[in-house]
């Protein structure tokens, strides 16, 4: 979940991997729930949702952002996709985007080998790759 400066709460509902797709829903300050978009991973910085839609079995994943004030969507959020995304975070100080991934083994995500995190500039240009441990699905930043 994440919240924006206008006080809305955004919820990532994962669906059932069958006939109900994962989606983002908004709870506004009047407690009204509305569907926003399909996505499987989400983070928020200021009034921007950073989203990945990587449903099970998909042949391609989408990386995009939505300005929560205007509703405008930015497609192709990053210039170099990861193999099998499992986490996303945005540095609250720099705006850099971090996406974690499983490595692929035999054409499938490996849940037993080390994964990695790609770092992108705030405008989505790949800057660095970090090899990390197994299942790197959670990323966060500590505020001082």
What are these regions (language model features)?
Residues 15-19, 55-60, 103-111:
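Short glycine/acidic-enriched loop and turn motifs that connect beta-strands
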Residues 22-25, 62-64, 115-118:
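A short loop-to-beta-strand structural motif that recurs across blades of beta-propeller domains
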Residues 86-144:
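C-terminal closing repeat unit and adjoining cap/tail of repeat-based domains
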Residues 10-12, 50-52, 99-100:
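Residue position within the beta-strands of beta-propeller blades
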Residues 65-69:
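Short loop/turn segments immediately following beta-strands, especially the blade-tip
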